Amino acid sequence: KSSAASDVYKRQTLYSIVNNLKFFVTPDSTDETNLKKFVNTLSADQVQRLSWLPKDIDSNDDQLVRPLVLNAALYAENPSAKSEAHEIFTQNQDKLLSLSSDIRALVLQNEVKNYNSSQLFESLLEDYRKTSDSSYKQDILFALTSTKDADQIQQIVSYFEDADTIKPQDLRTWYFRTLSNNLGEQAAWDWIRNEWQWLEDRVGGDMEFTSYITVTARALHTESRLVEFKKFFEPKLNTPGLTREIIMDTKVIESRVAMIERERDHVNAAISNILD
């Protein structure tokens, strides 16, 4: 039993490392293509064994590992994983809430990323507004913010200040997820800088306010973004309650940028060598 538990732990660690490797590749580059191929070699056999839907013969470990493996497969753009998830969505689109919560977020993300339409976007947004199920709400949030459509990104950002769509307590997650999407990064980063006063009026003085700086630092990872972060936040260093957060989060981005700069070529060369 302990070896099974350690196997799950190993896989969790492995996919967590893989997740961090994404910082080392430029979007739409050969390095990114190589990383996706590498992730596919790590996950393809497991995807085939586990597939999307729970089975009677699943062990506890299978149930824990399935979402990790499928998430990796979708990042790798594994064709069979994508089409199987699309089929599950199509068969359940009138009853998405009844999908197994283990895979629902991934099924929805796959649909938005790879089979998107304005109708799908509006339909999920409407479900988000209406549902009282917090788990389903979160799954929709994760799906919509992974869109590859620039107009939809702008639409999402336009809802940041619409409390009828996005409740204030959910705004930070919407912001962070949009900022973490390569296509959404600029729009979300522009929004927080342009609307800082609005945000301060809305949540300033609240413990949650400084966490907007924390999640911003968690997503930004390039030299140019570091420069912009400093330019925007350094004049706010004397704001009561923000000083420590700004200093710490500047260091977070600085150390990440330095590490990427130092290791990028080694990491990408190593992945390329594994594939050769």
Explain the meaning of each model-derived region.
Residues 1-276:
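Long, ordered, helix-rich scaffold segments
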